[in-house]
């Protein structure tokens, strides 16, 4: 697992208060991890801060799963 994946999963566990075992790449933030729309906005903000990257609104809307976040950040973070 990549460093980015580890960091994304840590952020998800901290922000959503879920068990680390539930945070898989296929886990949907809302359907599987119990996030609401505010939680997803806060997650995007946390990803932006952690990875020093801006996630445009249109891209943020496509980040539905842990794997989506990892792929976006692997492609766009320095």
Curated annotation (Swiss-Prot):
Pathway: Lipid metabolism; fatty acid biosynthesis. Keywords: Cytoplasm, Fatty acid biosynthesis, Fatty acid metabolism, Lipid biosynthesis, Lipid metabolism, Phosphopantetheine, Phosphoprotein. One of its GO terms (molecular function) is acyl carrier activity. It comes from the Bacteria. Gene3D superfamilies: ACP-like. It comes from Methylobacterium sp. (strain 4-46). The keyword Lipid metabolism applies. It is found in: Cytoplasm. PANTHER family: ACYL CARRIER PROTEIN, CARRIER DOMAIN-CONTAINING PROTEIN. This is Acyl carrier protein. GO terms for cellular component: cytosol; membrane. The modification O-(pantetheine 4'-phosphoryl)serine is found at residue 37.
